[in-house]
């Protein structure tokens, strides 16, 4: 390449001398102009050629630099290994980016640490507040237990009290409605008795005159096949049939009212059962109750546990109640008598009139009696429950006295009707309502020994279980 440049230099020098000397045939002025034009063309060609050479040299320089960098990386890889390559060989701008990312990550870590510390402090405050609320609830439970004169080792559950209060309020409302219904029935029976007495005062009817209220036996006799077609088409028979239809219509209306009240009672009891199931589920989740016979069954009266570790659930009262009754027999008898009275009042006010049912001491009636004993849980007596019991006792007492007086008056005025009632037909008014269960009759007779002695034909004077007695019971 140096030789080529040298030869090129010699040729250019020769051409320059020829141009300077010029063509001797031309005049001096023209010779000078021709030399300048030739020099301009030559310089342009030379510049163009040099520009191409510069581009070629720059391209070769880039290739050589890339080869050099690759060679250096290969040498460093052979000396230091693969791990050190990524650490050592970074460009300047890449290192700056990495440093900036590291700084941002440090700032985020610091902010997260501050947030974590704030969350820990807030959690500590919440724990302290929770402990204060727990202490407050425990003090309130103790105060409530002291107010209600409960046992200090068995704190009363406030939720159970609220649930019981709601249930008793619903039952009280239902009892008021049933009392109004029974009052209307008593008024109707009074009117029937008055009509019967008026008809007897005017004179005896010819044969089978009806007075508006019939017994089941009279209805069966009137509608039997033997006598149904033989009724004469007289005004008396038409009046009897009208009275029969009216009595049956009134009975159907009463039964519809009873069914409606029974549905409302079932709804209230269903809500009560749902609340109790929810309470039991809560106790089961918390570990205070499990299915009987299971591995996790908890015995609240386990003597192996110390008194401080025993559960303070309200269910403990149901377990320890029998032992307390055995320890004090007098108090147990008094409490049993009060429970029987409240049970009788509850049955008298809540149970609908069992019209048309046979007076059989069935298991259903026994279960109702047992259910009445468990009607009041082993919680302190609430004022609403006492009001219900006192109201029921007053109503029962008034209805007993009134019915007894009316019954004696009717028997004095109509001795013939009492003799007829011994054979089976019903007196005016109430036999169509059917019989009461024997448990109700027994409780009623036990509460009225004096009235029973003065009226020995009490059970016979009112056939079909005594409709008046059903009225007295309610």
Curated annotation (Swiss-Prot):
Per the database entry, which stretches of residues form a coiled coil? 1-199, 259-286, 385-414
Looking up InterPro entries in the UniProt record yields: Coiled-coil_dom-contain_pr_149
Superkingdom classification of source = Eukaryota
Region: Disordered, residue numbers? 301-388, 405-474
The cross-references to Gene3D superfamilies, in alphabetical order and at most eight, read: 1.10.287.1490
> What are the alphabetically sorted keywords of the record?
Coiled coil
Compositionally biased tracts (Low complexity)? 343-353
| Record Pfam families | CC149 (PF09789)
Keyword Coiled coil: yes or no? Answer: yes
State where composition is biased (Basic and acidic residues). Answer: 323-337
Stated family: Belongs to the CCDC149 family.
Name this polypeptide is given: Coiled-coil domain-containing protein 149
Species of provenance: Homo sapiens (Human)
Name the gene behind this protein: CCDC149
């Amino acid at each position: 390449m140096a030789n080529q440049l040298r030869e090129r230099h010699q040729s250019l020098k020769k051409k320059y001398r020829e141009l300077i000397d010029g063509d001797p045939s031309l005049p001096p002025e023209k010779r000078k102009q021709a030399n300048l034009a030739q020099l301009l063309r030559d310089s342009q060609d030379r510049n163009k050629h040099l520009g191409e050479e510069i581009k070629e040299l720059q391209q070769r320089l880039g290739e050589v630099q890339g080869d050099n960098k690759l060679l250096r990386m290969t040498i460093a890889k052979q000396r230091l290994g693969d791990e050190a390559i990524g650490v050592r060989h970074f460009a300047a701008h890449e290192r700056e980016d990495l440093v900036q990312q590291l700084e941002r990550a440090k700032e985020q870590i610091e902010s997260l640490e501050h947030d974590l510390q704030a969350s820990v402090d807030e959690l500590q405050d919440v724990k302290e507040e929770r402990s204060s609320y727990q202490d407050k609830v425990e003090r309130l439970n103790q105060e409530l237990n002291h107010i209600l004169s409960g046992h200090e080792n068995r704190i009363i559950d406030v939720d159970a009290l609220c649930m019981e209060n709601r249930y008793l309020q619903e039952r009280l409302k239902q009892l008021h409605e049933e009392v109004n219904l029974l009052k209307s029935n008593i008024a109707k029976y009074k009117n029937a008795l008055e009509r019967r007495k008026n008809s007897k005062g005017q004179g005896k009817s010819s044969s089978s005159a009806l007075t508006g209220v019939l017994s089941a036996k009279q209805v069966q006799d009137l509608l039997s096949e033997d006598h149904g077609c033989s009724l004469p088409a007289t005004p008396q028979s038409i009046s009897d049939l009208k009275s029969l239809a009216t009595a049956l219509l009134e009975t159907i209306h009463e039964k519809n009212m009873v069914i409606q009240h029974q549905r409302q009672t079932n709804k209230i009891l269903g809500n009560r059962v749902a609340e109790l199931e929810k309470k039991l589920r809560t106790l089961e989740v918390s570990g205070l109750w499990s299915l009987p016979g299971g591995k996790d069954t908890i015995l609240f009266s386990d003597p192996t546990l110390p008194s401080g570790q025993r559960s303070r659930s309200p269910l403990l009262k149901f377990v320890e109640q029998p032992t307390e009754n055995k320890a004090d027999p007098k108090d147990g008898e008094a409490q049993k008598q009060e429970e029987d009275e409240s049970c009788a009042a509850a049955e008298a006010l809540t149970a609908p009139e069992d019209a048309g049912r046979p007076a059989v001491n069935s298991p259903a009636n026994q279960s109702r009696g047992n259910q009445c004993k468990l009607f009041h849980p082993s919680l302190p007596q609430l004022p609403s429950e006492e009001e219900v019991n006192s109201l029921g006792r007053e109503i029962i007492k008034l209805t007993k006295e009134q019915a007894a007086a009316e019954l004696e008056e009717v028997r004095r005025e109509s001795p013939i009707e009492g003799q007829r009632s011994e054979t089976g037909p019903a007196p005016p008014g109430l036999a169509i309502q059917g019989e009461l269960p024997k448990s109700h009759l027994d409780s009623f007779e036990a509460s009225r020994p004096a009235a029973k002695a003065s009226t020995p034909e009490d059970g016979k004077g009112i056939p079909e279980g005594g409709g008046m007695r059903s009225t007295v019971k309610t």
